[in-house]
Structures are given as C-alpha cells and as structure tokens.
Amino acid sequence: MPIIRNSAKALLFHQGKLLLNSHLDRSGAPYYDLPGGGQEPFETMEEALIREVREETGLTVRPLRFLALAEEIFTNPQMRQRYPQYCHRVMHIFLAELVPGVPQTQAEPDFQQTGSVWVTPEEAGALPLVPIQLRGQIAQVLASSSPVYLGAVRRDEVCM
C-alpha cells in the first residue's frame, strides 16, 4: 500500500554558504538535495530534522523557522511497486543553523549519497537540486514572511 512520507529538510547556511548533499542517480548523473529525511513515528518534524541532518552530515543543527512545503509524486508503476514508501513525499523545509561548540560526528550517508558540499546560493541555483521546485527560489523562500507552498511535481522515472 502506498505511503505518504513526511520528511524534514534543512536550508542550512554557514559563512554565506548553503549545505547540500551530493548524490549519484541510477544513471550515474549527479544531483543535490537538502540535508534531512524521513520522519519517524512519534517524532516531531524538528526532531526529524535534527536527527536526519546529524546522520547524513555529522552536523548538529537547530531549526529556526518553517520556510516551505514541497511535494514529489512518482507516477512510474515500477517505482510505486518497488518503493511504495518513497512514491509520495511531502518535504517540510526549515531554516536551520549550526549549534555552536558541538563537534562534527561521523556521518552515515544515505543510499546514493556521495558526500556533502557547501556552495554559494548562486552556485546552488545552477545545480540539479531536489526538490525541483526550490531551484531558483531559495532567495524568495527566505524573504517570505510566511511559509510558502512550492507545489507538487509528478515524476515518471525510477529514481532508486
């Protein structure tokens, strides 16, 4: 049975740069996403954000405010059958900051994750970024006085 997967993602800036996780897709092409991931039962979105960022990057963050929501729906029947838990994702995007004085721990990268990189906002605008709806919209999302619904995208490929 298909599942709607909630995830918490961080827009994490440090010294003017944004942290992104780098990945390779099934074809070997690079793409980037915000650190963060799936919410566990009985876990708040903020708790999920802190846990997932620490797992993927080894960094300890503090959520500052909820910025945006984006949905990703995979329509490919093969994808839906093999990975029902990833076929409809609702990404809750938070502005976050590093917690000062906490040393970085060993990261436990996700499947297909090749590392983490700090990039300028301009560099991020030129990268294949997930969620797709955030491409070219980071400044507008940060400038908004209230959370932004970035919409839903339907994707036909098998991504895992």
Give residue spans per PLM region.
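Residue-level recognition of beta-strand microenvironments
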Residues: 66-69
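Conserved N-terminal beta-strand and adjoining loop/helix that marks the start
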Residues: 1-19, 40-41
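Nudix hydrolase/Nudix homology domain
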Residues: 27, 32, 104-160
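Unchanged
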Residues: 39-62, 73-130
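Short connector loops at helix/strand junctions that flank enzyme active sites
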Residues: 5, 13, 34, 61, ...
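Conserved beta-strand segments that form the floor/walls of ligand-binding pockets within enzyme
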Residues: 19, 33, 93-95
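Residue-level detector of family-conserved "landmark" positions at structurally sensitive sites
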Residues: 63-64, 134
